Each structure stands twice: as structure tokens, then as C-alpha cells.
């Protein structure tokens, strides 16, 4: 765990981008706005937000939006770090939220292809830091 002001500048930038992306979230049903930002191997940042749909569960989580966009825009390039932030109408969550199982598995597939992807989960009071996606999903699908 860490506080925002204890992080390196590059990690603060990644979290800031994830926080910015909550504003692009389309969440009229849940009112839960999530942003994700991925730092690529070339230091660029690719980001996404959750996009809901009335035909639930046809929406897409922020983490998958970001990783699929990263893979489409920079195919084959390793994803080194992901930051996730969530907000409701009053503001950002005090405690970090974690990716759902589907997002963990999707991120893990890219991690298996290109090596560890560090995970930063933002909360106003604290930030959880994980060395890899695999550390969030100990009993994952491994045969792919």
C-alpha cells in the first residue's frame, strides 16, 4: 500500500490518467465511473473507461477497454503497468476497487504473452500495489 504523494512521478501520471478517464465513462445504470490507464513498454499511455449498455452484460469494463485498445493500437507491445480508479457522483472511492474476474483473466493473457504487468489500484486514502496481474488471480486459466 502507498499514498499518492509517496509514488514516483510516472506512477502519479498513470493514476491521474485513470482518474481523468472516469469522466469519459458511460455508466447511466450503475452510476459507477471507472477509468484505467496502461503504461506501455515505449512509455506511452493507453487509457479506457467503462461503457455500459441497456442489454446488460453487454457493456465493457474500463480495464478491458484499455487493454484491448492498447493491443489494437500497439500490437505485440508489452503492457508494463495498469492503474485503475473509480468514482461515483460524490467523488472518487476512498478505498481502491479491484478488477472483476473477467478483467483479471483478460489482463493476465497479455501478461502471459509479454511479462509482468504491475497493478495500481487507486483510492483517495490508499493505493494498493500488486507486482503482477497473476497476483490478483491465483487460480487462473493457464492453458491458452
What are these regions (language model features)?
Residues 26-28:
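Short Gly/Pro-enriched turn/cap motifs at secondary-structure boundaries
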Residues 1-24, 68, 77-144:
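C-terminal binding/interaction regions
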Residues 37, 50, 57, 61, ...:
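Gly/Ser/Thr-rich beta-alpha loop segments that engage phosphate groups in nucleotides
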Residues 31-40:
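Short beta-strand scaffold segments in enzyme catalytic cores
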Residues 49-56, 89-93:
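A short glycine/serine-rich beta->alpha loop
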Residues 53-72:
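A short mixed-secondary-structure module that forms the rim of ligand-binding clefts
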Amino acid at each position: 500500500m502507498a499514498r499518492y504523494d509517496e509514488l514516483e512521478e510516472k506512477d502519479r501520471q498513470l493514476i491521474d490518467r485513470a482518474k481523468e478517464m472516469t469522466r469519459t465513462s458511460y455508466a447511466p445504470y450503475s452510476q459507477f465511473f471507472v477509468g484505467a490507464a496502461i503504461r506501455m513498454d515505449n512509455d506511452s499511455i493507453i487509457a479506457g473507461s467503462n461503457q455500459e449498455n441497456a442489454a446488460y452484460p453487454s457493456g465493457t469494463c474500463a480495464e478491458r477497454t484499455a487493454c484491448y485498445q492498447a493491443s489494437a493500437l500497439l500490437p505485440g507491445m508489452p503492457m508494463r503497468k495498469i492503474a485503475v480508479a473509480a468514482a461515483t457522483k460524490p467523488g472518487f472511492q476512498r478505498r481502491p476497487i479491484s478488477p472483476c474476474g473477467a478483467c483479471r483473466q483478460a489482463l493476465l493473457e497479455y501478461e502471459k504473452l509479454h511479462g509482468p504487468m504491475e497493478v495500481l489500484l487507486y483510492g483517495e486514502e490508499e493505493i494498493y500495489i500488486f507486482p503482477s496481474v497473476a497476483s490478483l488471480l491465483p487460480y487462473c486459466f493457464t492453458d491458452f
